[in-house]
Amino acid sequence: MSSNEKIFSVLRAPRVSEKTARLQEISNQYVFEVSNEATKADVKAAVEQLFDVKVKAVNVVNVKGKSKSFRNRAGSRGNWRKAYVRLVDGQSIDVTAKA
């Protein structure tokens, strides 16, 4: 697996919401959806390599999927993993840029 494949297998998507926008402004933190097997070291390496920034800290949270029903059938959404990435002061990522 090449390094680009490794990066894109670790980082799935940026999470953009009011809360994440506030975190970006206040504490220079960015939120990404990552693979369930990704470690903090994997996330740090992927962000530093992809966006060419210096990462100060990474916190990872496992999010449990919600129970949902559809036409009287019980089901659930999948579990996923979220990474909070704090950058060194003075650096930023444009997560809204188009590829």
UniProtKB/Swiss-Prot annotation:
NCBIfam families membership: PRK05738.1-3, PRK05738.2-4
Gene3D superfamilies reported in the protein's UniProt record: 3.30.70.330
Function (record text): One of the early assembly proteins it binds 23S rRNA. One of the proteins that surrounds the polypeptide exit tunnel on the outside of the ribosome. Forms the main docking site for trigger factor binding to the ribosome.
Subunit relationships: Part of the 50S ribosomal subunit. Contacts protein L29, and trigger factor when it is bound to the ribosome.
Gene Ontology BP terms: translation
The family this protein is said to belong to: Belongs to the universal ribosomal protein uL23 family.
A single cellular component GO annotation: ribosome
Keywords: Ribonucleoprotein, Ribosomal protein, RNA-binding, rRNA-binding
InterPro entries: Nucleotide-bd_a/b_plait_sf, Ribosomal_uL23-like, Ribosomal_uL23/eL15/eS24_sf
Protein name: Large ribosomal subunit protein uL23
Source species, domain of life: Bacteria
Keyword RNA-binding listed: yes
GO molecular function: rRNA binding; structural constituent of ribosome
